[in-house]
């Protein structure tokens, strides 16, 4: 690839001491070499920051390490990463996931080959301590209507032109966007006339366990509804469409955690995606 724009990989890290090395190593192993990794520790109480510092000391020219004075949640943390980023392109990454070695190479090539596209995501594999159990396939050409029935992009997989974050002023650091900062981003992304696409190839592995489901609390679902109301108004969706979201929120709130875990385990055993 002749033209190699710099990619800033932004990663908020919090209490991920046991998985962080694997995440960072997957970036170090990228076939695309013009990148910087920006880590921001969000007030971890384990050895996460110390481990990140070791990597920073070993790769001082490629890794930038920041630290919040206290736990400020993901939106604030990612905005700090964006402030430090110097790349033309911005990639997301989580501290407990894995990027395939050719992820950046293929996503950069896609953006360079599609100048009308400002963001590209990809399919991703879900895995746990037992191994990979399914692949999540995205809509390859999502638009603003996609948000009505599913997410247009898997947040941690995206590579974005810097102009997107500059135009949107980063992530919304408000209570209503807590744990749904990605959904808020998609609403504002489409409201500003941007276009995105997905590569239907798994270039990213996302780690899932019992804590992943437990974190999807009633409060986070309520925040999702608040953000949905905001987004539907922003994009001019009919008010009646909100009824579907309200009913979905009620249904999810009354289903107990054990039932959700049983359903997910059953899907894994049946090989369903």
Tell what function each PLM region has:
Residues 1-28:
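N-proximal low-complexity "stem/linker" segments adjacent to membrane-targeting elements
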Residues 41-50, 70, 94:
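A conserved acidic beta->alpha catalytic loop
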Residues 68-85, 106:
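Glycine-rich, basic loop-to-helix element that forms the pyrophosphate-binding segment
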Residues 83, 143-218:
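Conserved nucleotide-sugar donor-binding catalytic segment
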Residues 90:
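Short aromatic/hydrophobic "clamp" motif used to bind/position activated sugar donors
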Residues 102-134:
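Conserved donor NDP-sugar-binding/catalytic core segment of glycosyltransferases
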Residues 190-194, 214-237:
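Catalytic core of nucleotide-sugar-dependent glycosyltransferases
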